[in-house]
Amino acid sequence: VARGYYAEADVEELHRYMNGLLKPLGAEIDAFYYCPHHPEHGIGKYKAVCRCRKPETGMFEMAEQEFEVDKAASWMIGDKLIDVEAGRNYGVRSILVGTGYGSQIFDKLKKEEKSGREEEPYDFYAEDLMGAARYILEQGRDHRGRE
């Protein structure tokens, strides 16, 4: 949006399309959050420094205004380090997925690990979104010991 490739209406249409695909499967995304801004390359009103651009936590804070968020039971899933960094900044666990940029980042981090990096910047790596979902379900819905 910030660079002018898509309008906000296009993003909203994509969100409706995604929920349309999920609905027959019995799933629905309750709310979508995105940052339309870019601090350097934004056009017009979209050229802005903001709290909603990852790795800041503004989008998480927007969700807190709408929903009761249990950080202990919440996850951030993304294909870039900035995604998992945003999750860490907010205080939730994170999963790097291998789709999109994720597999390249994972391979690069594995090479760095061999050269002395101490810890992963994410809590789990999954090949794809389905793998991430399975992992989260394996952990249990309530991370305080209840199913």
Task: Label every PLM stretch briefly.
Residues 1-6:
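Conserved strand-turn element in the central/C-terminal portion of the radical SAM core barrel
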Residues 8-31, 40-76, 80-147:
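Asp-based, Mg2+/Mn2+-dependent phosphohydrolase catalytic module
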Residues 35-37:
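Short loop/turn motifs enriched for small/polar and acidic residues
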